[in-house]
Curated annotation (Swiss-Prot):
It catalyses: [HPr protein]-L-serine + ATP = [HPr protein]-O-phospho-L-serine + ADP + H(+); [HPr protein]-O-phospho-L-serine + phosphate + H(+) = [HPr protein]-L-serine + diphosphate. This is HPr kinase/phosphorylase. Its EC number is 2.7.11.-, 2.7.4.-. Belongs to the HPrK/P family.
Amino acid sequence: MKPTVVSADVLFEDHRATLKWEWVAGLGASERRFDEVAVSEARSGADLVGYLNYIHPYRVQILGEREVAYLSHVGPEDSARRISRIITLEPPVLVVADGQTAPDTLLSMCERAQLPMFATPESAAFVIDVLRAYLSRHFAERTSMHGVFMDILGMGVMITGESGLGKSELGLELISRGHGLVADDAIDLFRINQTAIEGRCPDLLQNLLEVRGIGLLDIKAIFGETAVRRKMRLKMIVHLVRRETLERDYERIPYEPLTQDVLGVPVRKVIIQVEAGRNIAVLVEAAVRNAILQLRGINTYQEFVERHRRAMEQDD
């Protein structure tokens, strides 16, 4: 599920420093929000901000140099008609960018209609980039999953499995081997675009890892700044299972790579059996290295199948 609400005052305050903007009209409409239907139907935050567009009134409408010229470099009646059309469509916010001065007619109509309008010296393209990234994060589909989320060799890896299999201990060993912790226990996952899932740690659990028998460990304080990450893209799920579960539910060597659906995005999945004497940390590292090879187009299993086929043909 994704949130469907962000108000004009929150949008303004969150970017006051970055965009150096001022609230020039419609200050009484600080609670004005995006149309909830438009938000729920938007494929990403990119659909919710753009240059002046009469066809998509639900967007944050950005007025750069050309848009301001379109509104002002005509006769008074035409200018008033064009501006009135914008006001009638009731966009959530208007932003005058490129250091442009808003026409007096636009200011007065926004004030009369209580339509929030911001003015910034930053370029229109920069404003659009910043707001698209912000709205993509804010309105992203989201969920929470149980496990340990790690940065292993630059790849975001989520370790899952039933309780008592040693996920946190595995995470601790991987940290001691130079990898980074993103989140332990609860992982907040966001679909930031159609093909990417981003994982973060809830603020309450930031930098913390719980190990049975020891308690809570502050990984940043113990191992240093480089041992923690603020967020990572989810690229792989390592699922820990007991031996009987592995033999019952999974093939030993699957012909097709396993995947797990997370917020509508298929994520590569690897099953690792937990058993006394097995070095799970090394196995996880090997699985990640193998996945990196596959991303480069090197598939060891397919190469083995091809080698086996050629050997059989030679025997015949």
